[in-house]
Amino acid sequence: MARRPWHCYKKIKRPSYQKKRSRSHRKEYVRGGPDSVLRMFDTGNRKRPLGDWELSLGIKIMHDLQLSHRTLEAIRTSLNRNLQKHLTREAFLIRIRPHPWQMIRENKMMAFAGADRLQSGMRNSFGRVMGRAARVHANQTIVEIFCDFQNKDIVIKSLKTAAYKLGAKNRLAVLRMKKPEEHSTKIGLMIALEK
């Protein structure tokens, strides 16, 4: 059966169903479902300390919405592929910020002749888990890339390509910078420095 289009789940309008592993080992309300497609949240040079990078650029989302785990993985692979074409793996670090904890449910319906005799319609319509999502809020950072000033043009171009995969309004921003008084005029992006 084909996947339901994501605009059915994009808005945050339902209660959150999270799959948790508690210490008391009590049964959770959400069971089963597929694992997240997104396995790696950090890609690139993970050995270099974060304080040593000269610059950090990222994508900030403009609205409250849910992002599927497939979207986050598509952003990560797109960035990784584009950056490795031009830079070595030691020259950048990609970090995906939100984690897909929310379980997305679907009440599967049959759509063919005589289907009304085989299914129960909206009775017991809670549905089964069919995927995962991350709930993000306005002005939240989705992805962050650490790099040096000499590679900033390549990183900005890769971020613009990856931003199309979000399917929502977003903007590129400078998140961290060494010596902002020297370099702030040379970047050409909104500066939203994080502590």
Each model region followed by its residue ranges:
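Ribosome-associated RNA-binding proteins
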Residues: 1-195
